[in-house]
A protein has these predicted regions:
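Accessory RNA 3′-end/elbow-binding domains used by RNA modification enzymes
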Residues: 3-5, 23, 57, 63, ...
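RNA pseudouridine synthases
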Residues: 1-163, 229-230, 237-239
């Protein structure tokens, strides 16, 4: 059902997990119209089937409604917790819990193809977006219902499917470490800057220091090229967002 990019963090790089969790994700998904299930995908129990009579114009209009910031109710079959219990565990016991709508942002929603009652969509979205729920909501808005029948994550943060390594290939490799990426690659969207020896010393001590740079977020490196930290500059002063150097 679900395949695609899954970055794995090891060693000191685990300090970057919190940034990855907030990164945008891109998916390609298949939406099956005319079928609704309790899990909002084709693995669940069918709730109803309806005839599909959706015109291209209707589809275009409905998809437009789901672009930008939207409100989404998390599905019961999810790992979210209510009073310490996962919603999916409650759902398996036949219990329903009221869930409050949450804002999510759909940066891109593109119809890639349509074959019969199956739509193939590309979705670029914010953290916390449930693609299953998006599919179900689109189906409901079209008046015929719908559920997700396939999902592939094609990009997670700065990492794309083209860079991904199949698990079996990784397990069988005699030198799996060759597939490792430096943690600073996840911040390549930010400009990099080399620190002076004195600035590096202050950085390693956790102190802020003056820099002749405009405000913003930066990748900071030592003179030898070691990635030291993700940093922010405000009013000509650089300070640490998160350090990545090894502590001696």
């Amino acid at each position: 059902m679900a395949t695609g990019v899954l970055p794995v963090f090891v060693g000191r790089a685990t300090r970057g997990v919190e940034f990855f969790e907030h990164a945008e994700k891109t998916y390609e998904t298949e939406l099956l119209l005319g079928v609704a299930t309790d899990t909002e995908d084709t693995t669940g129990t069918v709730l109803f089937r309806r005839e599909v009579s959706v015109t291209p114009g209707q589809l275009t209009a409905v998809l437009e409604r789901f672009r930008g910031e939207i409100m989404q109710i998390p599905p019961m079959y999810s790992a979210l917790k209510v009073n310490g219990q996962k919603l999916c565990d409650l759902a398996r016991k036949g219990r329903q819990v009221e869930r409050q709508p949450r804002p999510v942002t759909i940066h891109e929603l593109t119809l890639l193809s349509r074959e019969g009652d199956t739509l193939r969509l590309r979705v670029r979205c914010s953290k916390g977006t449930y693609i299953r729920t998006l599919c179900a909501d689109i189906g409901e808005a079209l008046g015929c219902g719908g559920c997700m029948q396939a999902l592939r994550r094609t990009q997670a943060g700065e990492y794309t499917i083209a860079e991904a390594v199949p698990l079996q290939q990784l397990l069988e490799s005699p030198e799996p470490e060759t597939y490792l990426r430096d943690v600073d690659t996840m911040f390549r969207g930010y400009p990099g800057v080399k620190l002076t020896a004195n600035q590096e010393k202050r950085c390693r001590n956790g102190n802020a220091f003056s820099v002749p740079l405009p405000g913003g977020t930066y990748r900071a490196y030592s003179q030898s090229g070691e990635f030291l930290m993700l940093a922010k500059v405000e009013d000509g002063v650089m300070s640490t967002i998160k350090s990545f150097f090894d502590v001696q």
